[in-house]
From Swiss-Prot:
GO process annotations (BP): methylation; translational termination
Organism: Streptomyces coelicolor (strain ATCC BAA-471 / A3(2) / M145)
Binding-site residues for S-adenosyl-L-methionine, renumbered to this chain: E142, N184
Organism placement in taxonomy: Bacteria, Bacillati, Actinomycetota, Actinomycetes, Kitasatosporales
Keywords, comma-separated and alphabetical: Methyltransferase, S-adenosyl-L-methionine, Transferase
Biological role stated in the UniProt entry: Methylates the class 1 translation termination release factors RF1/PrfA and RF2/PrfB on the glutamine residue of the universally conserved GGQ motif.
Name assigned to this protein: Release factor glutamine methyltransferase
Family annotation (PANTHER family): HEMK METHYLTRANSFERASE, MTRF1L RELEASE FACTOR GLUTAMINE METHYLTRANSFERASE
């Protein structure tokens, strides 16, 4: 075993003792980041090239600073995104939301589907859809100026129409024209604050995490926004907490102009997102 792999083994134990959920992966990611190699190439780093700063970044992760803040990058589907303080770090669970959205858009057989991403954050969802649905017209909105600093970096050179504003009033010029509305909004109940992982609670912006006493305040508002934006037959996809699968689909009721409301699991088989179709006239 070379020196770097031995140090990674020690770092793994330290991170595990600190309660980090994925200690081995994070120890390897930090080593790869600092030494400019891929995780699978750590064994190729000569002992003489070991960077003593490794223990500095391990200490930061040990203190539960997000891995993505330390490395400045987050991976989402086929994207590498720039992230840091002020913007929500995209989660693997949201990849299931995007996968379902892509399948839904392709099934529509629309030549240039119009897609809106509400609460875009880093831009992960919007950019993934623009990349994987090549002829789509993708629009995204974000309220926070701090988050937008990162969004603009990630979207530089892309064809996504990015705007700053409130998701509830966004894109009046697209009313009734949108094929798909997608959102990963804040949905954590304020009462759950103390149970949120330190990486999120202490580092993600509160605006991107919490939404009222039951966590559903913004989703209730987005239901009306989605209905306003969508064409008849258009689809909405909204992420939620794994404890809200029995509640969110009921926000999209027939009485409010929806059909086919349903809930869907993520790759870990936990309730993760709700979908509904705007009813035909």
């Amino acid at each position: 075993m070379n020196l770097l792999l031995a140090e990674v083994a020690q770092a793994t134990q330290r991170l595990a003792d600190a309660g980090v959920p994925s200690p081995r992966t994070d120890a390897e990611e930090l080593a790869a980041y600092l030494h400019g190699v891929k995780r699978g190439e750590l064994h190729t780093v000569p002992d003489a090239d070991f960077d003593a700063r490794y223990w500095e970044v391990v200490a930061r992760r040990e203190a539960r600073e997000p891995l993505q803040h330390i490395t400045g990058r987050a991976y989402f589907r086929y994207l590498e995104l720039q992230v840091g303080p002020g913007v929500f770090v995209p989660r693997p669970e949201t990849e299931s939301v995007v996968g379902w959205a892509i399948d839904a858009v392709r099934a529509m057989d629309v030549v240039e589907p119009c897609i809106v991403d509400l609460c875009t954050g880093s831009g992960a969802i919007a950019l993934a859809l623009a990349q994987e649905v090549p002829r789509s017209r993708v629009h995204a909105v974000e309220l926070s100026e701090d988050a937008l600093k990162w969004t603009r970096r990630n979207m530089e050179g892309s064809r996504v129409d990015l705007r700053q504003g409130d998701a509830l009033t966004a894109f009046p010029d697209l009313d009734g024209q949108v094929d798909l509305v997608v959102s990963n909004p804040p949905y954590i109940p304020l009462t759950e604050w103390e149970y949120v992982a330190p990486e999120a609670r202490d580092h993600d912006p509160e605006l991107a995490l919490f939404s009222g006493e039951d966590g559903l305040d913004l989703i209730r508002g987005l239901e009306r926004t989605a209905h306003r934006l969508l064409r008849p037959g258009g689809v909405v996809v909204v992420e939620h907490a794994d404890t809200q699968g029995g509640q969110v689909p009921w926000i999209f009721t027939e009485e409010r102009g929806w059909a086919d409301a349903a809930d869907h699991p993520d790759l870990n088989n936990r309730p993760r997102f709700a979908t509904a179709r705007k009813a035909l006239p």
